[in-house]
Structure formats: structure tokens, C-alpha cells
């Protein structure tokens, strides 16, 4: 059964169709939520909020072929809400400390562990240092492999805005990564 048919059935309250949609989308949505939020707990909350909203609001979806953009839009809105809540709790120093911990490892054991996970961890730390809007664009463009047009549609932005955010986010990440390398030496 194709996705459009699943969505039509889901609109009529079919739980099995919802389960199939969940199976298809929960991994990419969780990955994106994790990269946007920066931690597993928030990503799990965002994922849950995303699918609850999806189930409750599926009737508002006009075009079944727009479902992917629609559900990623719900996820990014939930992530924004969670980040706003979290920003009241966590000082910016925590992000800087996290990058410092990743970039500086003195013992051989820590160095070995760093080697095994360095690329992924350093990129995630650099990503977490970006502002929310830049992080969303980077995650959707690179991790979800959406085109600039698709990212713009998902986030409700102009394509030029997406290109601009990508440009400045890349520059900031490059600077963060270069600073991390300098600290290691």
C-alpha cells in the first residue's frame, strides 16, 4: 500500500495505518530531533509530541503527498518549543564546556575513545553550538537530505533564507571545528 493510501486510511481513524507511518518515519524524525535538541531525552519527547500531533491533526493535511514536509514541520515546531523550555534551564556555558570536553582529552584511554567517536561527537557538539534556526536547516539539509526548496517548504521559509542560514551555519561550524582542533594541539 502506498503512503497516500495509508494517510487516507489514517484520516479515517485506522490505527494500523498510523502504525505503518510510525514505522516509516520514527527513525528519521528521531535522528533529526536528536540533532536539533542535542540530547536523547528531549528528542524522545519531541518524537512523542510529533506523533501525537500527527494523529490528532491528520485531518488538517490537505495533500497526502505533502505528508513528509508536514510531519517534519510538526517535529521542528515541537523541537523549537522544547528548546525554548530547555533554554530557561541550561546556561550557554554548558555548550562551551561540552565542546571543551570533546576537544581536550589527556589520558590515552580518553584519546582512544575520542578516536572512535570523534567525528560524530565533534560534529554534534558543533551543531549544538548553533542557534536553533541554523541547526534546523543543517539537520534537514544534510541529515535528511532535503533540497533547499524542500527545507524552505518544511520550515515555511523563503529559499533565499534557507541558503543564507546554511551559509552562516557552515561558517560557524567550521570556526568551532577549527577552534577544537587548535585546542587539541
Language-model segments: residues:
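Amphipathic, Lys/Arg- and hydrophobic-enriched alpha-helical face
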Residues: 22-40, 57, 127, 172, ...
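Structural recognition of an alpha-helix C-terminal capping motif at a helix-to-coil junction
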Residues: 31, 45-52, 65-77
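Arg/Lys-rich amphipathic alpha helix in sigma70-family domain 2
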Residues: 59-63, 73-93, 168
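Short, basic/polar amphipathic helix motif occurring as a linker/hinge flanking DNA-binding modules
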Residues: 82-104, 114, 118
Amino acid at each position: 500500500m502506498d503512503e497516500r493510501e495509508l494517510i487516507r486510511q489514517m484520516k479515517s481513524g485506522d490505527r494500523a495505518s498510523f502504525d505503518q507511518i510510525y514505522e516509516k518515519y520514527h527513525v528519521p524524525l528521531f535522528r533529526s530531533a536528536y540533532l536539533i535538541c542535542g540530547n536523547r531525552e528531549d528528542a524522545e519527547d519531541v518524537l512523542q509530541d510529533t506523533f501525537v500531533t500527527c494523529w490528532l491533526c491528520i485531518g488538517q493535511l490537505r495533500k497526502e503527498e505533502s505528508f513528509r514536509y508536514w510531519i517534519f514541520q510538526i517535529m521542528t515546531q515541537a523541537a523549537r518549543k522544547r528548546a525554548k523550555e530547555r533554554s530557561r534551564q541550561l546556561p550557554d556555558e554548558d555548550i562551551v564546556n561540552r565542546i571543551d570536553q570533546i576537544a581536550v582529552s589527556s589520558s590515552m584511554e580518553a584519546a582512544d575513545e575520542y578516536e572512535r567517536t570523534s567525528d560524530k561527537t565533534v560534529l554534534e557538539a558543533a551543531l549544538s553550538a548553533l542557534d536553533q534556526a541554523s541547526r534546523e536547516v543543517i539537520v534537514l539539509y544534510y541529515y535528511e537530505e532535503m533540497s533547499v526548496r524542500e527545507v524552505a517548504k518544511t520550515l515555511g521559509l523563503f529559499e533565499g533564507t534557507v541558503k543564507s542560514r546554511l551559509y552562516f551555519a557552515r561558517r560557524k561550524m567550521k570556526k568551532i571545528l577549527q577552534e577544537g582542533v587548535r585546542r587539541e594541539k
